[in-house]
Amino acid sequence: MENPYEITAIVAREILDSRGNPTVEVDVHTPIAMGRAAVPSGASTGTHEAVELRDGGKRYHGKGVRRAVENVNKIIAPELIGMDVRWQREIDKLLIELDGTENKSNLGANAILAVSLAVAKAAANSLELPLYQYLGGVNAYVLPVPLSNVINGGVHAGNELDFQEFMIMPIGASSFREAIRWVSETYHVLKRVIMGKYGKNAVNVGDEGGFAPPMKEVTEPLDALIKAIEEAGYKPGDEIALAIDAASSEFFKDGKYIVGGKEYTREELLDLYKELVSTYPIVSIEDPFHEEDWEGFVMITNELGKKIQIVGDDLFVTNPRRLKKGIELGAANALLLKVNQIGTLTEAMDAAYTAFRAGYSVIVSHRSGETEDTTIADLAVALNAGQIKTGAPARSDRNAKYNQLIRIEEELEGIAVYAGKNFRKVFF
């Protein structure tokens, strides 16, 4: 008798991401269903991330992924065909073994992850379950607070802002649908605020849909956000809070942090963060120090960790080993979860549970180069993470995730809980 959950075919192809760069998409087939997944790509990447395989050469300026696609079609597919699509952990283990390197540089993390995610989707579709329920079970019911990146700086934009992201968090909303409305309304008011001060050319958007105005001082975007929140009719802090991704590895040079043209020591930069947190309703700071500045992370966690969320992105790169080191040291109190930093769904979920067990919060995150794939929306609900970071409410690659969360909330009507002000500890 035919096993309806047996993998019968795996097909990979090269498609384009939101920046017009190639990425990998994979279809996994069973006799009764198909799962499709496409992988994202980051601009500010941590040194310890799993490695994307790119072709080099002239084609696509060296960014083609035909080698990764070939690795799926010729190496991975023959090994997985015949396996039960529901064996996610076994399949991911096999993918890691087939690659044989610690950073997945042989087959490519982009090839491996596309297969891993497509397997999960094929299993969910074969079982006629929504992906969030397949991954999280009947207890997956918490809708996340969006950390919406509405002003872009750093490597995501062409302005002089050193900090990479300035985000709004609708913590006072009563549902995800209300939260995303608050974000959208504030975003449109922000456009007006920026145009009024910097002119109509200042509302071009960055990779993640946020505006990239000609700002330089770190306080300029924060002041603009407060003004936009108030003019949209909301209360800064109580209803809509602020969050920052400093991405400080990008402005760390020769042992110093360069912000706004000024040099800062670790201690001076910590003082700047403390001043910002005391002045503005900031509830989360991501990558406040360089990815190897463990001491800086410990310092800021000791100083501000009881009051706000200190997030490790480049610090942890969704890597369980680096996360465990951070937990032992007391560095940061939150994990930014990016599935493509580690390369398989199993490893990403393991990292999330490691964080939860240590009392760390988890933010499921997109990358700056995205696709229309909505897996991370389902993953945020599956984990009851309470937070998702997936850009401004603009550009279809970002809104695809928000729209999926709206659908999930609708499916869970009567059961769904919006994390709101409990975004850091949804069950406490």
UniProtKB/Swiss-Prot annotation:
InterPro entries, sorted: Enolase, Enolase-like_C_sf, Enolase-like_N, Enolase_C, Enolase_CS, Enolase_N
EC number: 4.2.1.11
A Pfam family the protein falls into: Enolase_N
Disulfide bonds, paired cysteine numbers: none
PROSITE patterns for this protein: ENOLASE (PS00164)
Localisation: Cytoplasm; Secreted; Cell surface
UniProt KW keywords: Cytoplasm, Glycolysis, Lyase, Magnesium, Metal-binding, Secreted
Binding site for Mg(2+): D245, E286, D313
Gene Ontology biological process terms from the UniProt entry: glycolytic process
Keyword Signal: no
Active site: E208, K338
Catalytic activities: (2R)-2-phosphoglycerate = phosphoenolpyruvate + H2O
Family, similarity comment: Belongs to the enolase family.
Job of this protein: Catalyzes the reversible conversion of 2-phosphoglycerate (2-PG) into phosphoenolpyruvate (PEP). It is essential for the degradation of carbohydrates via glycolysis.
Name the record gives this protein: Enolase
